[in-house]
Amino acid sequence: PFDENDESLDHMRALHPKVKAWVAEHRQLQESRRAENRQRSRDFWGGSLRHISDLTARDRYRFRVTSTLFRAIEKQGGQIGEAKLTGKVTFLVSDQELKCVIAEKMSRATKIIEGAGKWTAFPHHHQTGLVSSGFLRVRFDTYVNGRSRDWIETSKKKMAIILPDIVSAIIAAG
């Protein structure tokens, strides 16, 4: 449902510094886990710890969308406050904080699907029993004008098309 090669989004080699830090942290965690497992394999009682997966296409897509959104907000005069790997972000616009979540749209699994958690390298960031819908969702956690805003990607409306509306709403909320 998504185009991993969408040219309107930031490339993985040119991500926003906050998003680039997430990728670097993930790689560093993978390397330290490999080193720890090598060390444990030499121990008599040593069992290995769970392997940390590579970033999936869905992870890379979410990172590219997030990076593009960050750059657009900064271009409009906003700032990026706190930005967590889970997708929780704080934007600072005109000295006003706006909390937002950029995450995978999840749906309840009606039956157990083999390999259902393989869509992300971060399965511990999501509730069990939920699976990816294949679309991203951007939600304001801060109420603006008495309501919360929500944008959900669909097969007809890709996130690259929705991003200008999101940027406008964030800047207008400040």
Task: Name every feature range the model reports, one short phrase each.
Residues 1-174:
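Long, charge-dense low-complexity segments
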